[in-house]
């Protein structure tokens, strides 16, 4: 793959879409991970003065916030920090008492989505989503959370290719080398939670063989079980 050309084409595609719909700028969450960093760098190339990154800690890992700040500084990105921790905690105390770890954790990206759309509507900006093709295949995301966006620039780019795109965009090495994580809880990583590496997943998505039968079956199962996330809600036809 010619990563330089892909990066140039990607930036142009995003810019063309923004022009087509009359967007005044872009807004997105800046999580401290590589996907949001790539989104931020693309946004800055299209709208150098009208790109806003929201850092939205929500009972989050401090290191992620620090990394998000470093990325913003590296690309000279305008940012706004909105701490959603107290909002999350109040919801937990008042309404959501279940000990289901995933159900509780998924509230966080949904709060962030709500915050992003408040500012997007106020500013006339489009919300950029950070989902990549590897996550999209499994829909390793929160429905109506981080998957809620107006445009998904990297949704057709596999995770292993995202690292190369990041290099083309001039992002700092620390973010390229950081272990992918949704930051849902301390110590959580994508690959630990999935049970296989992105290299294995991407090879399978490309049509290559997966060495272990159990992993292939798990990927197939996750793809099937998450199919409802990749389509609009079904409607009864009269």
What are these regions (language model features)?
Residues 33:
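Conserved G/P- and acidic residue-centered "switch" motifs that form tight phosphate/ATP-binding loops
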Residues 113:
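A short, conserved alpha-helix within the catalytic core of class I
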């Amino acid at each position: 793959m010619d990563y330089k050309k892909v990066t140039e084409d990607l930036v142009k595609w995003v810019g063309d879409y923004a022009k087509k719909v009359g967007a005044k700028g872009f807004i997105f969450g800046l999580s401290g991970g590589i996907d949001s960093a790539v989104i931020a760098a693309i946004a800055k190339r299209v709208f150098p003065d009208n790109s806003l990154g929201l850092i939205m800690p929500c009972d989050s890992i401090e290191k992620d916030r620090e990394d998000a700040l470093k990325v913003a500084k590296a690309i000279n990105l305008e940012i706004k920090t909105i701490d959603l921790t107290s909002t999350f905690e109040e919801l937990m105390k008042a309404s959501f008492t279940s000990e289901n770890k995933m159900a509780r954790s998924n509230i966080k990206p949904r709060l962030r989505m709500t915050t992003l759309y408040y500012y997007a509507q106020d500013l006339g900006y489009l919300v950029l989503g950070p989902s990549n093709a590897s996550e999209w295949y499994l829909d390793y995301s929160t429905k109506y959370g981080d998957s809620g966006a107006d445009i998904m620039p990297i949704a057709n780019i596999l995770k292993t290719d995202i690292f190369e795109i990041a290099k083309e965009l001039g992002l700092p090495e620390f973010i390229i080398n950081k272990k992918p994580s949704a930051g849902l809880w301390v110590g959580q990583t994508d690959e630990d939670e999935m049970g296989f590496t992105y290299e294995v997943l991407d090879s399978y998505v490309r049509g290559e063989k997966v060495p272990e039968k159990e992993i292939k079956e798990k990927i197939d199962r996750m793809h099937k079980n998450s199919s409802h996330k990749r389509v609009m809600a079904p409607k009864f036809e009269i």
